[in-house]
């Protein structure tokens, strides 16, 4: 039987749709409206119910038809009485129709009343989501909302049907009904970090190649070392391929692959970490044997330590006559990097990137450190990873270099990359070869996304392209909203508030000073500050001006910068404003300690400075009883505002300082009066105004620290 709508079925039986709906509801069948389609079993049930009425209607109709037929037979051949009989027949038919209507009406009235639905049983267990309302919880328990509201009232809670319930209240009410409750954890699919899991406990996880970043001071041989490793380990078959610069490359050593990130120094490393990406497994710190520890070397050490990544020191340029590897080891011990030969845990490898000496030893050490770390991934999982580089190519459109961290990436996969999305059209490896799949720790360049992502953005593959599009668009909209909001980086002004909310455990501090002695003294003094709830943690100290790299580190570590007798350069100023990084510049150590200690205790009062906003000359005075002296004034400079502080100046000497009482233009109150206009002014608690006096208006403006 084909599906019928309720109104069609009612029309067939010459009934109202409401009667059918009422009957369905009495059968505990949910009905939304008369347009709802009826299932076969529902039609059968309705047929049984209305069968008697239908039979009665049919029987009555048959009798009427039979009577009409007899009348027609009797009228044959009787021409004279035709009209009379016809009129009688018509009357009879009208009477029959009337009877039919009465019968139907009686049938409707005699129809059995629908029985009220039996109350539903209270379930033994229900699940709920955070923020569930009284009405929603009542529906889950199959009880009236008024019952829940009564129970809440007995608990001392006045609530309505739309009131949200907390976990404790839900458990109390459920316990009263003997129902077990369980909270549903709603997973935000737009948060890509939930797809990144530790694979060590996965039984199907297998060993993956280590990801290595090379950092160090300028001209210490980072690029030469990268080139030397690459050229030493590229096989004959690969040598013919055109090298594709995708920000990373893979080599093979003793049957095991190693992935090197070819990033421009530690700035990119920190930028990626600031976006939440942790891609590096091992850091190679390159130090020239003839130059020793330099400022960028120290920065690289601090960046690697902040990321909690193991460090292998590569002492380069040992083939130079002026090289002194022992001096390098000695200098690095000051920064916690103690060689294994001296009883420490840091691996030192002397090498020459130019000649290739020691390269094999370095690769062997990388393999050992990777083995200890037990780096694993599951190639069968969905592909997830991080963006290394991204650009807009004129011919290919947006492209991104990705590092696959888990799972296997395939051409044709629907992907979300940061706030962008798309379907992978093509995939190229570091040798410029087109590939179809890429496993864990493999760097690839892809095309097919709708926009250019940022370095450090995460990517996740989804099975459905519509889902990827929806998530990508939602993330893009959310990022626009987030950019409009102020950054939540810590500052001394909001430090105590973050401490109260439990957001701050450590106050990360970067100290830059004019001389090493001052820097060390300041660091030691700050470490002695003892405030319950937060610790001062010095993450970087150096001599010299505050630079952009310091701001980048502070932003990544959610820290502040203290400059002692030094100033930030132009790049650092711009970066600090863009990232909302707090910089404090001081000349006295005591002031630094006092300011930070006060901030940690929540006692840091805002500083204000006075700003003169206008002057008015008293042209005439009027004495009014119960009001005092009214000064008719002319604004000569700036403006006079109603909420401003004022001082009365006579012959260059301040006579009084206080507040405005009234400010009027003609007879109307005014919020402000600009230069060139006249106004009437009264001063609170001061009536000794004279012609020629100058009323100076000022405001107290908070100094931005």
Curated annotation (Swiss-Prot):
This is Translation initiation factor IF-2. InterPro entries: EF-G-like_DII, IF2_II, IF2_N, P-loop_NTPase, Small_GTP-bd, T_Tr_GTP-bd_dom, TF_IF2_bacterial-like, TIF_IF2. The lineage of its organism: Bacteria, Bacillati, Bacillota, Bacilli, Bacillales. Residues 40-124 are annotated as: Disordered. One of the essential components for the initiation of protein synthesis. Protects formylmethionyl-tRNA from spontaneous hydrolysis and promotes its binding to the 30S ribosomal subunits. Also involved in the hydrolysis of GTP during the formation of the 70S ribosomal complex. It comes from Staphylococcus aureus (strain MRSA252). Residues 262-265 are annotated as: G3. Keywords: Cytoplasm, GTP-binding, Initiation factor, Nucleotide-binding, Protein biosynthesis. Its main location: cytoplasm. Residues 352-354 are annotated as: G5. CDD domains: IF2_eIF5B (cd01887), IF2_mtIF2_II (cd03702), mtIF2_IVc (cd03692). GO terms for molecular function: GTP binding; GTPase activity; translation initiation factor activity. The gene is infB. It is found in: Cytoplasm. Belongs to the TRAFAC class translation factor GTPase superfamily. Classic translation factor GTPase family. IF-2 subfamily. Residues 41-58 have a biased composition (Basic and acidic residues).
């Amino acid at each position: 039987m084909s599906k019928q709508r309720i109104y069609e079925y009612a029309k067939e039986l010459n009934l109202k749709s409401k009667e059918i709906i009422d009957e369905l509801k009495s059968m505990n069948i949910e009905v939304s409206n008369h347009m709802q389609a009826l299932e076969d079993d529902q039609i059968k049930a309705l047929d049984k119910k209305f069968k008697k009425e239908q039979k009665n209607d049919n029987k009555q109709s048959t009798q009427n038809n039979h009577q009409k037929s007899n009348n027609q037979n009797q009228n044959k051949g009787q021409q004279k009485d035709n009209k009379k009989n016809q009129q009688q027949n018509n009357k009879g038919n009208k009477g029959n129709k009337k009877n039919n209507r009465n019968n139907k009406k009686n049938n409707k009235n005699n129809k059995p009343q629908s029985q009220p639905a039996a109350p539903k049983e209270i379930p033994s267990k229900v699940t709920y989501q955070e923020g569930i309302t009284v009405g929603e919880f009542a529906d889950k328990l199959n009880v009236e909302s008024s019952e829940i509201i009564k129970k809440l009232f007995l608990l001392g809670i006045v609530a309505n049907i739309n009131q949200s319930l907390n976990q404790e209240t839900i458990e109390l009410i459920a316990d009263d009904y003997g129902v077990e409750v369980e909270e549903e954890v709603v997973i935000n699919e737009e948060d890509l970090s939930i797809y990144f899991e530790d694979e060590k406990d996965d039984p199907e996880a297998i060993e993956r190649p280590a990801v290595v970043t090379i950092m160090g001071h300028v001209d210490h041989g980072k690029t030469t070392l990268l080139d030397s490793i690459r050229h030493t380990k590229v096989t004959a078959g690969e040598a013919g391929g055109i090298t594709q610069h995708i920000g990373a490359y893979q080599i093979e050593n003793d049957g095991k692959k190693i992935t090197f990130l070819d990033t421009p120094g530690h700035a990119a490393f920190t930028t990626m970490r600031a976006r939440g990406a942790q891609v590096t497994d091992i850091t190679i710190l390159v130090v020239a044997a003839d130059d020793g520890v330099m400022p960028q070397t120290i920065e690289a050490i601090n960046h690697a330590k902040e990321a909690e990544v193991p460090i292998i020191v590569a002492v380069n340029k040992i083939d130079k006559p002026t090289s002194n590897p022992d001096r390098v080891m000695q200098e690095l011990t000051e920064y916690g990097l103690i060689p294994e030969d001296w009883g420490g845990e840091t691996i030192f490898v002397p090498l020459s990137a130019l000649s290739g000496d020691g390269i094999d030893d370095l690769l062997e050490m990388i393999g050992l450190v990777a083995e200890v770390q037990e780096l694993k991934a599951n190639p069968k999982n969905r592909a997830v990873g991080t963006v290394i580089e991204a650009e807009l190519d004129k011919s290919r459109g947006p492209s991104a270099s990705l590092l696959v961290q888990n799972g296997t990436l395939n051409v044709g996969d629907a992907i979300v990359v940061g706030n962008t999305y798309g379907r992978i059209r093509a995939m190229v490896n570091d040798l410029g070869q087109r590939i179809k799949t890429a496993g864990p720790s493999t760097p690839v360049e892809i095309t097919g996304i709708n926009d250019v992502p940022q370095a450090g953005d995460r990517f996740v593959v989804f099975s459905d392209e519509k889902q990827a599009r929806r998530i990508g668009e939602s993330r893009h909209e959310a990022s626009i909203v987030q950019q409009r909001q102020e950054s939540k980086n810590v500052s001394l002004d909001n430090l105590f508030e973050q401490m109260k909310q439990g957001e701050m455990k450590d106050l990360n501090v970067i100290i830059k000073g004019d001389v090493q002695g001052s820097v060390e003294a300041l660091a030691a003094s700050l470490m002695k500050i003892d405030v319950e709830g937060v610790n001062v943690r010095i993450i970087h100290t150096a001599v010299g001006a505050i630079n952009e790299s310091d701001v980048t580190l502070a932003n990544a570590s959610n820290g502040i910068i203290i400059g002692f007798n030094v100033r930030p350069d132009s790049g650092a100023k711009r970066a600090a404003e863009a990232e909302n990084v707090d910089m404090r510049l001081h000349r006295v150590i005591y002031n630094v300690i006092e300011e930070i200690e006060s901030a940690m205790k929540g006692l840091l009062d805002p500083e204000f400075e006075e700003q003169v906003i206008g002057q008015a000359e008293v042209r005439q005075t009027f004495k009014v009883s119960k009001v005092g002296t009214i000064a008719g004034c002319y604004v000569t400079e700036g403006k006079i505002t109603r909420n401003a502080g004022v001082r009365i100046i006579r012959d260059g000497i301040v006579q009084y300082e206080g507040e405005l009482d009234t400010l009027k233009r003609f007879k109307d109150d005014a919020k402000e009066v600009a230069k060139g206009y006249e106004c009437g002014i009264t001063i609170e608690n001061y009536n000794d105004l004279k012609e020629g006096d100058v009323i100076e208006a000022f405001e107290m403006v908070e100094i931005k620290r």
